[in-house]
Amino acid sequence: MKLSTFINLLNSGQASLLSQLLKTSNEFYRASFISAALSRGVYDNFMDGKASFEHLCQKMTVSNREGLSAWLELGVSLGELKRIGKEYQIKGRMSKALLDPKNDAYRALLQEIVEYHYVYVVDAPTMLRKHEWFPFDTMPGELVARSSRVSEPFIFEAVDAAVPLQGDFQLLEVGCGSGIYIQRACTRNPELHAVGLEFQEKVAAMARNNIEAWGLENRATIEHADVRNYSSSQKFDLVTLHQNIYYFPVQERENLFRHLKEYLKPGGQILLTSVCQGGGPGIAALNIQVSTTEGLSPLPDPDQVCQQLEAAGFVEVKAGRLVPFESIWAFHAAIAQ
């Protein structure tokens, strides 16, 4: 490049713009590459973080060797892979961290961002102009159940505050997802029994498998049901809803809370946790998703949730952030004795 060309780029501001675009695109490519390497099983073919090119071609039954080589070289250029001769090694910190089973929730969250949030952000303007909604049945329920576990440490605190350490206690969980919060409640109180409702059949099956794996099948039951049509003579001490209030239209939430009151014992309580309006970019992207998908609705406003609980007849309504400086909230209320 000639010096005059470089000076012109600097003076025009385009050099700075190009630098910003390159930085942004590199992180976009990094997220896409890592997510694909994990979700498409490429990293599964590495042994102790290493794999030869021939081994990958064989395991992946690839005929387009040039295409696979080009894809792997993107990983090398990003620093996620290292190539020594004809062998590739997993090098990137994020790749290594997300391969750890204990970080599965973060692995799922990355895939959700790359494969789903991206689509909502890019396609929402077109869908809105066409007066169309994203279909609900394309939502990856099992993936969302996994990624939602990123919030576990904060929601665990809310569960612990609502569940006593001992004594007979009956829990109804609406939208139980993976069942992890039922497990938490059962672990906290060995006398607790729970019913988990799950709207999506595949997610309900996953929760049942988890309950059995945790040895809780005699204490927890998972039902595939829409809570709005749920009927039971059983009364509960606590009803919980974690990260799913936006699955119910705003205008239906007050009636939902009234419906849930029917299943509570005198003095029973409700615990609701949710991301709410006013968060960072990740929460803003989620709000696009729930605001443009059929059957869902925008993330809740904390004040509005409190008002709806009170209008439904709950007392002692309290709300508070679970995470400082982020819009993840817990709402707690009770019915009269």
PLM features: what roles do these ranges have?
Residues 24, 36, 74-169:
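Conserved Class I S-adenosyl-L-methionine-dependent methyltransferase catalytic core
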Residues 178-190:
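Conserved SAM-binding loop of SAM-dependent methyltransferases across substrates and taxa
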Residues 200:
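Conserved SAM/SAH-binding beta-strand->alpha-helix loop
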Residues 228-239:
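A short acidic, Gly/Pro-enriched loop at the edge of an enzyme's catalytic core
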Residues 254-266:
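A short glycine-rich, Lys/Arg-flanked "PGG" loop and its adjoining helix->strand segment in the class I
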Residues 267-274:
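Conserved beta-strand signature within the Rossmann-like core of class I S-adenosyl-L-methionine
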Residues 277-295:
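Short, glycine-/aromatic-enriched active-site segment of Class I SAM-dependent methyltransferases
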Residues 297-313:
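Short alpha-helix
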